[in-house]
Amino acid sequence: MVSINEELEVAKAAKAAIKALLPATSKPAVLATLKKANRAAILNLSSGGALNEARGKVGIALSSIMHGLPTKEKIDEAKSAIDAWIKELEGSL
């Protein structure tokens, strides 16, 4: 488990990384950043609330990208999930 501040840093890095990802490409550095974000979101899941819902959505969206070809729809879904995750993390500080 990581602190909220560390999780927020990872979330912001994922937001920057996802912007570099294009449909039908998989860049190793981008995927490594997304994997780290996915891990942080999943490891910090607890019993409920808006933050945990955001973590779950990020986990699903990032897994979809990491385990298949990134499509525009998957990338857009991940961007939206990351934005919601960041918003909830910032609200938890």
Predicted regions, residues:
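Short, flexible coil/linker elements and helix-boundary hinge sites characteristic
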Residues: 22-23, 49, 59, 82, ...
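Short terminal alpha-helical segments
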Residues: 1-32
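Amphipathic alpha-helical binding modules
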Residues: 63-93
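Charged, amphipathic alpha-helical oligomerization/scaffolding segments
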Residues: 9-17, 36, 53, 57, ...
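Charged, low-complexity interaction regions
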Residues: 19-31, 42-52, 66-75
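Intrinsically disordered, low-complexity segments enriched in Ser/Pro/Gly/Ala and basic residues
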Residues: 2, 25, 45-46, 62-63, ...
